[in-house]
């Protein structure tokens, strides 16, 4: 599917943030590991979370899926599947599932998309080797063998992906000797690790960590207990609607964004405020009023998913917008630093790619044109927002990739006044 976005000078109305992808993934995993019935109210159904749901089913849980409620029936015991677990393009699914399948003590096969297999896996391989678990990679297939791991002390890099840390933490409490996880480099996206720890706590499993989050300890013998989750809105997805309001100087209300969310990308509200937008909270509703924007320096080490949409904001801000701490964006669904640079430049942006970030000179008068999503959901959504202030229509190729994280994205854009044409 391709989508043409018609420029829109003013938005209005309200929408609801899609449910949190990060929380949905983690609640599914914790439900699998619990003995009993775990309920997810308002879960996110998208390509990635559906991949995790399929993995949970493959490992022995029974899922009942309704429109706004998922129910997980599990014994808390993992069974080795007869067929490969398909992780699709979901990095979270793959990185959470590998440590879990090692607990079965059986040879278990997984498979993933070609693009996912280009993303780093080595830190997890090296960590599991210390637990006498081997990962063999053959093309798009992954074989895990050598378990079950007994636990103990394990070292891992913290600056490649927080998902490796979260995956090991989920599995750690089920190891005979518990788990001590030592990070050899500082953790990035710390709030996602904190979110994992909070979901585990809600299921009765406690993780101890030091202040700088370089050492984690899980005592053995802890049991996951079933619970009920109400999944709140996703800041990383809502960022696109909020940015659309900011660049069009519009007033928009976004529901279901609690101010105390543990997700790293909630910092986006602070960034918007620093750039000049007016932000107000009323309970769990964010009210944004777009105003003249100014460029700022933003380090996104703990919130890398914001990189593409921050580059778009930079195109509409006065002065320089410098985005740093973004080296990990090269290993996402696409090389996001290269992708957003090439596509924004194609429609007139003054943007420079750097080794670990981007420099945008604004305001950049964007023009009509055709751009490529690189089959990357966050690139597609960022380009759709960029098109709102362009001098003419912008066509986005392969825009269906938004279903990876935000299936209703274009519908939600239309709900606040944007005209889109699918073709």
Where are these regions (language model features)?
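Short, structured segments at the rim of ligand-binding sites
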Residues: 1-423
């Amino acid at each position: 599917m391709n989508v043409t976005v018609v420029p829109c000078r003013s938005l209005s109305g309200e929408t609801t943030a899609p449910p949190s992808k990060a929380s949905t993934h983690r609640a599914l995993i914790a439900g699998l590991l619990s003995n009993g019935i775990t309920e997810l109210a308002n879960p996110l159904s998208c390509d990635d979370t559906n991949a995790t749901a399929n993995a949970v089913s493959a490992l022995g849980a029974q899922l009942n899926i309704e429109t706004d409620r998922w129910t997980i029936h599990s014994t808390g015991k993992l069974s080795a599947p007869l067929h490969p677990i398909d992780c699709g393009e979901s990095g979270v699914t793959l990185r959470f599932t590998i440590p879990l399948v090692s607990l079965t003590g059986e040879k278990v096969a997984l498979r993933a998309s070609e693009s996912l297999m280009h993303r780093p896996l080595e830190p997890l391989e090296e960590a599991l080797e210390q637990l006498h678990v081997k990962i063999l990679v053959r093309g798009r297939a992954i074989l895990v063998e050598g378990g079950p791991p007994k636990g103990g002390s394990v070292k891992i890099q913290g600056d490649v992906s927080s998902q490796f840390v979260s995956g090991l933490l989920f599995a750690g409490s089920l190891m005979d000797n518990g788990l001590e996880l030592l990070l050899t480099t500082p953790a990035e996206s710390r709030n996602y690790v904190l979110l994992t720890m909070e979901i585990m706590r809600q299921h009765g499993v406690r993780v101890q960590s030091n202040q700088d989050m370089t050492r984690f300890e899980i005592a053995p013998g802890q049991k996951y207990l079933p619970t009920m989750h109400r999944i709140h809105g996703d800041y990383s997805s809502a960022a696109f609607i909020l940015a659309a309001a900011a660049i069009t100087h519009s007033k928009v209300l976004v529901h279901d964004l609690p101010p105390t969310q543990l997700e790293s990308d909630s910092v986006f509200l602070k960034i918007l405020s620093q750039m000049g937008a007016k932000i107000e909270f009323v309970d769990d509703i964010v009210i944004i009023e777009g105003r003249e924007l100014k460029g700022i320096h933003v380090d996104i080490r703990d919130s890398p998913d914001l990189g593409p949409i921050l580059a778009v904001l930079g195109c509409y801000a006065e002065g320089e917008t410098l985005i740093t701490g973004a080296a990990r964006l090269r290993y996402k669904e696409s090389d996001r630093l290269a992708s957003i640079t090439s596509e924004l430049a194609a429609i007139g942006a003054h943007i420079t790619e750097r080794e670990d970030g981007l420099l945008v000179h604004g305001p950049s008068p964007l023009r009509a044109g055709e751009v490529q999503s690189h089959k990357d959901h966050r690139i597609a959504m960022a380009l759709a927002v960029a098109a709102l202030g362009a001098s003419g229509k912008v066509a986005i190729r392969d825009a269906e990739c938004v279903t990876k994280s935000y299936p209703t994205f274009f519908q939600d854009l239309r709900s606040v006044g944007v005209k889109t044409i699918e073709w």
